[in-house]
Amino acid sequence: MVKLENSRKPEKISNKNIPMSDFVVNLDHGDPTAYEEYWRKMGDRCTVTIRGCDLMSYFSDMTNLCWFLEPELEDAIKDLHGVVGNAATEDRYIVVGTGSTQLCQAAVHALSSLARSQPVSVVAAAPFYSTYVEETTYVRSGMYKWEGDAWGFDKKGPYIELVTSPNNPDGTIRETVVNRPDDDEAKVIHDFAYYWPHYTPITRRQDHDIMLFTFSKITGHAGSRIGWALVKDKEVAKKMVEYIIVNSIGVSKESQVRTAKILNVLKETCKSESESENFFKYGREMMKNRWEKLREVVKESDAFTLPKYPEAFCNYFGKSLESYPAFAWLGTKEETDLVSELRRHKVMSRAGERCGSDKKHVRVSMLSREDVFNVFLERLANMKLIKSIDL
């Protein structure tokens, strides 16, 4: 039986006037506050001093296609990918964005603008990242159109397939589904937000036309709003840069400088054998611990389901490892509206229907603060007990 901590309101976000029974656990979003404790222990190693006269210009490097990319961030990105071995950076253009969300929109815009006919179909295999729907429908562009689930897509003409691997929300390793290798109008955007060794085995060095990464899910620094794209084709990269210029006239330099500093510190910790010092070892152990606790709660219940992930050899750690995804794809064996049932127990989650799936599934963030996660486990276990009593 899994041992749960005594219930208490999470210290940093609780209101002392709210009883514990009324506290709402919000695991709908992927706010990665789980890593706060690690970075707190790092003390001043990530501190950046910015004077009032620093970083005032729009421009960073006018010789770079992405002229608002700070050179020190570009170097830090290349160095980290080199150490981890998860993506090729040679002969590529690095485009920085305000998170990978802006970069995904920029990539869809770029590929659509270069297509021979429009609107270009945009698809993703279900269950898919729910925000893809919003990103491709919100501005009602005539250049592209959301066509939904890639599994059943057979429409002729240009299309863009969004491939997230490991997948958000279910954590599975994904490849393209539509697969039209001889079609020069077939384009793919690979989202590798979670392809890092604390979440999944690094099985190969990814080498695709457009690869997206986000600072927030590597280190937990979501508030910095930094992402980057590794792009092979110069014209696509130029179009992406143009989109970002029109959308936000570049990307915050303060955020870029801070990101570069933290990525460099992270890279240095990779040399350490200490689990408390080496960020990826720390993160993997934390995620393993959380997944083991969640699986124990689910095992003791006959009501819930979780995916199983095969072991794979991780080139970074040099051994076979399991995956510990950033989100849990929680299901129920009954024909139950699970998001509503969890809400009834004051747990917020992402409805499976928003991800192209069904009401029996929800996406639950595994990246909350430890005390919030423990409250979630206790409430999930209590739902199991209520189920048993009803039977």
Curated annotation (Swiss-Prot):
Class of enzymatic activity (EC top level): transferase
PANTHER family: BIFUNCTIONAL ASPARTATE AMINOTRANSFERASE AND GLUTAMATE/ASPARTATE-PREPHENATE AMINOTRANSFERASE-RELATED (PTHR43795), L-TRYPTOPHAN--PYRUVATE AMINOTRANSFERASE 1 (PTHR43795:SF117)
Protein's name in the database: L-tryptophan--pyruvate aminotransferase 1
Residues with the N6-(pyridoxal phosphate)lysine modification: K217
CDD domains: AAT_like (cd00609)
Organism: Arabidopsis thaliana
GO biological process: auxin polar transport; cotyledon development; cotyledon vascular tissue pattern formation; defense response to bacterium; embryo development ending in seed dormancy; flower development; gynoecium development; indoleacetic acid biosynthetic process
Phenotypic consequence of P166S: In wei8-2; loss of activity
Chief location of this protein within or outside the cell: cytoplasm
GO molecular function list: carbon-sulfur lyase activity; L-alanine:2-oxoglutarate aminotransferase activity; L-methionine:2-oxoglutarate aminotransferase activity; L-phenylalanine-2-oxoglutarate transaminase activity; L-phenylalanine-pyruvate transaminase activity; L-tryptophan:2-oxoglutarate aminotransferase activity; L-tryptophan:pyruvate aminotransferase activity; L-tyrosine-2-oxoglutarate transaminase activity
Activity vs pH: Optimum pH is 8.8.
Keywords: Aminotransferase, Auxin biosynthesis, Cytoplasm, Pyridoxal phosphate, Transferase
Compartments in which it is found: Cytoplasm
Catalytic activity: L-tryptophan + 2-oxoglutarate = indole-3-pyruvate + L-glutamate; L-tryptophan + pyruvate = indole-3-pyruvate + L-alanine
Pathway where it operates: Plant hormone metabolism; auxin biosynthesis
Temperature sensitivity of activity: Optimum temperature is 55 degrees Celsius.
Cofactor(s) demanded: pyridoxal 5'-phosphate
Disruption phenotype: No visible phenotype under normal growth condition, but exhibits reduced levels of auxin (IAA), reduced auxin response, reduced sensitivity to ethylene and shorter hypocotyls and petioles but larger leaf area when grown in simulated shade. Defective in root gravitropic response and shows an increased resistance to cytokinin in primary root growth.
EC number(s) stated in the UniProt entry for this protein: 2.6.1.27, 2.6.1.99
InterPro entries: Alliinase_C (IPR006948), Alliinase_N_sf (IPR037029), Ethylene_sulfur-biosynth (IPR050478), PyrdxlP-dep_Trfase (IPR015424), PyrdxlP-dep_Trfase_major (IPR015421), PyrdxlP-dep_Trfase_small (IPR015422)
Induction (record text): Up-regulated by trans-zeatin, ethylene and high temperature. Down-regulated by auxin and shade treatment.
Impact upon substituting G250S: In sav3-3; reduces growth rate under shade condition
